[in-house]
Amino acid sequence: MSRHAERAARAAEEAALEAEEHFHFERVVGSFTGYEAAVAADARRTERAAARLAPELRALLPPDCLARRAAGLRAAAAANGAFLRAVVAGRGAFGPPGGAPPPAAPADPRARPTEADFSKVRSTLHSCVRDWAAEGAAERAACYGPILDELERVVPRDGRSRVLVPGAGLARLVLEVAARGYGAQGNEFSYHMLLCSNFLLNSGLRPNEVALYPFVDQPSNCRRAGDRLRAARVPDVVPAALLRGGGGGEPDFSMAAGEFLDVYRDQREAWDAVAACFFVDTAPVALEYVAAIWRLLKPGGAWVNLGPLLYHWVPTSGADLEGGLDARGRPTAGADDRYLRALEFSWDELRHAILAQGFELVREEWRHCTYTANVRSMMRTDYDCIFFTARKPAAEGLSLIHISEPTRRYAISYAVFCLK
């Protein structure tokens, strides 16, 4: 292939990737703006099922309980929908590179939100409770508390130490790190999470200003009828006030959007610590994260980790492997390479790899945690999480140099936003 043909092929591939990125962003936005209608459909289902219920069976229930439930679902959907539309309206310039794409044809399936997109909206609302509601305080204490305490133990708060928080979600852990006097940058890949965290951090909300109803999607395992329709108010604190409480002048806080390995591909020995919570198992191949964190840490730097090994890219159906491999073992069109190359490791295997990379394990213990748990549900998932600190040995005689502004590489869809 000639150089001209190679350049043309690369340009075509980049254009296709950018177009797909725009369609993906449209699906995310559409899932936010279409959330209310999706929940209202559940209210209609309740009404239809109630209408078919035999009168003698309906008489066994509290008076009008099903009608009240349907009305409550609609009211909760409207409140959540208003919040999600505000998130979209407040995104500013945040989005794919090149600005907003031209409107897609309504029939174009690439621009239409899928059930997976709506599922991520529901997960984002649950994460609002975990990170930004008083109801999530106990879960934050169990998950974030040990990490924050360990950072203070192993990383000096000298005004120069910088901590990277990959898989930052809605950014509460990053904010708590910065509030303790560290420079902190969070990294997140999900547009759903990034849009919502941008709004919560930068919209100037007052404490407990917004009432969300995050558990309307959980009709099962309710102890009381009202539990499903209860409100959680966000944010429990004003982000800027939390940062100011850390003292030490202007806080060093930012969020970087994009896939972890790509965003930080060109950085080396740039961070004093990496604080990871429920993150390692998001990798198709966790060994790549181990190698990347080693490269990113300065000599003497610490990797503080808490989380399970619930690997995200384990194929659960044939649809995950749709397209598969060609005769030469290469992914075909339509196949998600992350499913195709995913490898899962036990803790003892991952521990061996961490030590083989060169880390020294200075803490290793198990902690019970939940993740976006509904505290009033009759069913919750309890994780027995590995909590460890791995230190990159300091080179003998090396004088460590603080890097206040490491070089960043942003691929498609990457951006940075800071707390106003």
Please provide the spans of the model-predicted regions:
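A short glycine-rich, Lys/Arg-flanked "PGG" loop and its adjoining helix->strand segment in the class I
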Residues: E288-P299
